[in-house]
């Protein structure tokens, strides 16, 4: 496709529609593939501790490529970067379908996701401007939430029919995302001709990390969001083992329904935070963070499905109320110090590092034979204590 000189900045331009469709299909595939691959591990009798390791290889790719993916997105047409990234995801999903090692295939998907992330947000500013950019971000987030809900449930439901059906559906979703990327205009690269010296790129990224860590407000935000997303991913895997033990349900669909309750709650909590919390009153979100841990503790003791649904939605509401103001604080302060792109890249590194650490601890707990209910109780207690400590630190500084 030839390069476009004049960009149609309409919110519903052909290019914007292609971006939103590609994002939905790509995120749908990501979430469906997780639960489809977990079902494959169960069917092939992998040990239970290997389940969180699957996500660890995914986030490991994010961490490994964090210093470089931003420059990749800026050095080439972002639509083509998105196409390449979705192609990697398609290759990973297809390799799992055809019987290759699921951990290797899922690592390929993780590399694709790492490359995709900065390009998908960066292209919005190239396709729209002004107030339309805010609305475009809203459309992107709405399509992502819809994909998380539908993809998670589809992965579990289709896996109950047949694991290969679920895996094939994921590959088709990625193929659809690649096809949608074709319709994104080939815009000029934002910053072509940059140095590809790995050492210089790493040092530049390290400088951005240091700058944000030395600022009290951005450090507070980085720690808070990293704790939240690390805990959120760990909760996903906790549910997979908790459901058969606490509820006596052994299908693949029920954990995905429960995860969907958390996602719905996050949307509601995010809406409440937008109305009730400002950058000047960010500390209002901290009690919600502490309550997340308390509710996880009570949730772990449940043995009925309906209360479990209700408590997980409450966890989501508290989570949305907690994390949205912290995200806004980091973006605002980070934009003024290291730039919005660098701030997001550093945030991704922090969040994925927290995921890797928490999943590692969870996997170790399962490996040594600690029952899932005590793991849940300990997990909730430690999270509440960690957020309490963060709040005390923030008030003192």
From Swiss-Prot:
Q: What superkingdom does the record give?
A: Bacteria
- Molecular-function annotations in GO: lysophospholipid:sodium symporter activity
Q: Which residues lie on this side of the membrane: Periplasmic?
A: 1-17, 74-90, 166, 248-256, 302-304, 365-366
User: Pfam families attached here?
Assistant: MFS_1
Q: Where is the signal peptide?
A: none
Q: Which residues lie on this side of the membrane: Cytoplasmic?
A: 39-52, 112-144, 188-226, 278-280, 326-343, 388-397
The annotated topology with respect to the bilayer is:
Multi-pass membrane protein
InterPro entries according to UniProt: LysoPLipid__transptr_LplT, MFS, MFS_trans_sf
**Key word Transmembrane present in the record?**
yes
Q: Which UniProt keywords apply?
A: Cell inner membrane, Cell membrane, Lipid transport, Membrane, Transmembrane, Transmembrane helix, Transport
Q: Where are the transmembrane segments?
A: 18-38, 53-73, 91-111, 145-165, 167-187, 227-247, 257-277, 281-301, 305-325, 344-364, 367-387
The answer to whether keyword Heme applies is: no
GO terms for cellular component: plasma membrane
Subcellular locations according to the entry: Cell inner membrane
PANTHER family according to UniProt: MACROLIDE-EFFLUX PROTEIN (PTHR43266), MAJOR FACILITATOR SUPERFAMILY (MFS) PROFILE DOMAIN-CONTAINING PROTEIN (PTHR43266:SF2)
Summarize the protein's role: Catalyzes the facilitated diffusion of 2-acyl-glycero-3-phosphoethanolamine (2-acyl-GPE) into the cell.
The cross-references to HAMAP family, in alphabetical order and at most eight, read: MFS_LplT (MF_01585)
Family per UniProt?
A: Belongs to the major facilitator superfamily. LplT (TC 2.A.1.42) family.
Give the protein name, as stated in the record. Answer: Lysophospholipid transporter LplT
Organism expressing this protein natively: Escherichia fergusonii (strain ATCC 35469 / DSM 13698 / CCUG 18766 / IAM 14443 / JCM 21226 / LMG 7866 / NBRC 102419 / NCTC 12128 / CDC 0568-73)
- The gene behind this protein is lplT
């Amino acid at each position: 496709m030839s390069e476009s000189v004049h960009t149609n900045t309409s919110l519903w331009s052909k290019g914007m529609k292609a971006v939103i469709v590609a994002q939905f299909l790509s995120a749908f595939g990501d979430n469906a593939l997780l639960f489809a691959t977990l079902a494959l591990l169960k069917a092939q009798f992998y040990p239970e501790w290997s389940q969180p390791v699957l996500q660890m290889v995914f986030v490991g790719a994010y961490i490994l490529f964090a210093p470089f993916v931003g420059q990749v997105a800026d050095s080439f047409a972002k639509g083509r970067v998105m196409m390449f990234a979705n192609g990697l995801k398609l290759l990973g999903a297809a390799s799992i379908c055809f019987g290759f090692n699921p951990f290797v295939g899922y690592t390929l998907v993780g590399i694709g996701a790492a490359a995709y992330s900065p390009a998908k947000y960066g292209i919005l500013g190239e396709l729209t401007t002004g107030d339309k950019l805010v609305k475009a971000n809203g459309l992107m987030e709405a399509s992502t939430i819809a994909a998380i809900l539908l993809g998670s449930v589809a992965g579990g439901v289709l896996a109950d029919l047949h694991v290969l059906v679920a895996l094939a559906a994921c590959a088709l979703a990625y193929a659809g995302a690649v096809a949608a990327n074709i319709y994104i205009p080939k815009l000029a690269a934002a910053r072509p001709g940059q140095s590809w010296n790995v050492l210089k790129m790493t040092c530049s990224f390290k400088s951005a990390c240091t700058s944000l860590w030395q600022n009290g407000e951005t450090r507070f935000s980085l720690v808070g969001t990293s704790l939240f997303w690390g805990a959120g991913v760990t909760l996903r895997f906790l549910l997979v083992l908790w459901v058969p033990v606490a509820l006596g349900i052994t299908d693949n669909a029920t954990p995905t329904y429960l995860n969907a309750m958390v996602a719905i709650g996050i949307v509601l909590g995010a809406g409440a935070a937008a109305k009730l919390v400002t950058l000047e009153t960010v500390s209002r979100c901290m009690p919600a963070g502490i309550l997340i841990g308390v509710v996880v503790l009570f949730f772990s003791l449940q043995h009925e499905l309906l209360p479990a649904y209700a408590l997980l939605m409450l966890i989501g509401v508290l989570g949305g109320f907690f994390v949205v103001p912290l995200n806004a604080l980091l973006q605002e302060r980070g934009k003024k110090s290291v730039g919005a792109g660098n701030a997001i890249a550093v945030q991704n590194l922090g969040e994925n590092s927290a995921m890797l650490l928490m999943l590692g601890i969870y996997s170790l707990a399962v490996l040594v034979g600690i029952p899932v209910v005590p793991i849940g109780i300990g997990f909730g207690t430690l999270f509440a204590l960690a957020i309490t400590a963060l709040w005390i630190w923030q008030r003192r500084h």
